[in-house]
């Protein structure tokens, strides 16, 4: 549900005029996929960009829908194509292996395969496709650079910067670096090919996220590191850094009486972060656009703050100006 002016969440027929579709979807609504084996195929993951969406299935690959002005849906750009009220759902192919993760950036798409390879398509003006140029790419193309031959276990993007984590815990980045996201390897504001980031001091990385102007990683010990520009989580005095700085574990509830607390999962929106602990608690910080942090105020939050919820938080997702949590009730 949500904004649908580019059919980014499918075609939903109007009840008043059956020839038209809704531009706003106000309640959860099913999206029929063009499946060959609907009884066997399940949706594994969905990712949403500015105006396009990717759907990963277990047996029939990846589907895309919405705006394809830059090739972000993995198909040829058609001049003058009208995306409003479009019923087109495209099956993306051209992969050498099964896709196991899909991630939408603002106007680009990333795909990770079972072999640990990364493919990209879409808008590339900041190098966010990682294909060695700054043009658009209409079809998924495999990335090389420093990730060539490396087993990538996770990819992350949100705006125009991209990060990738290897099975050995190394971090790679490409795309926009206007806000110091990739300043550890270059003074350029754009990087068009994956580069290894020399963040040895953070330990073995298990997860990375990147927002509009900042980034963060979580290591295997449950410690969280942040860098870039904006509200990073270490108070109002740290608004810019090109090297990762650890957010004190005590801000997530670690103490001598509770030493086993660890951050287990990390999420991000355009300007805010969310962290889940192994105790089922949710902490948030960053720009509090329209109250998206859920902390009872619309003030920005400069360090992690625990969100009060009646249960254990199982998962969380962050949008541009909203946050959704999946909670298991105490009762």
How does the language model describe each region?
Residues 1-331:
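Eukaryote-biased RCC1-like beta-propeller repeat architecture
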